[in-house]
Amino acid sequence: MATSSHLNWLIIRNNNAFLLKKRDVKKPFSTEPNNLASVSSYRYSGIVHKKTLGVVPAADKKGFTAVLKKGKYAQRPAKNTVRVDFKAGPRRSLKKLKNLLIGSKYRKDLTQAALRRASAVLRSQKPAPVKGKKAEFAKGKKPE
């Protein structure tokens, strides 16, 4: 017999392997997969919900991958995840992700969090700007 997601959350909320408690922080963090905010809360939990959403960097470090869990195959772990790659460029990829989530009406409450996580992943893949003397050498000028 399947239990509700609320009951599952009440059971695991204070004690699970993904919980990360820090000193002087009221709300504990979470390291569980498909948790967009990395916060231990019912809304973002990737364990208790039938439909979850995760955004991870793509395998080749160009773009990101959206990992969706199908509610239909909740009892079949091998079949219940779908991975969608987004590599078209930052703005286009974010627009495609938004269209995917809004068009399919898949967890409307996670749309904004997914866009923020995808944007952070794309920002982390940008090369850092070179500053100082190294920048002058990169431009072809010699420092004086």
UniProtKB/Swiss-Prot annotation:
Q: Where is this region: Disordered?
A: 122-144
* Molecular function via GO: structural constituent of ribosome
Compositional bias (Basic and acidic residues) at which positions?
A: 133-144
BP GO terms, sorted? cytoplasmic translation
Keywords, A to Z, come to: Ribonucleoprotein, Ribosomal protein
Question: One Gene Ontology cellular component annotation?
Answer: cytosolic ribosome
The answer to keyword Ribosomal protein applying to this record is yes
Q: Name one Pfam family in it.
A: Ribosomal_L28e
* Family label: Belongs to the eukaryotic ribosomal protein eL28 family.
Q: What is this protein called?
A: Large ribosomal subunit protein eL28
Species the sequence originates in: Drosophila melanogaster (Fruit fly)
The UniProt gene name for this protein comes to: RpL28
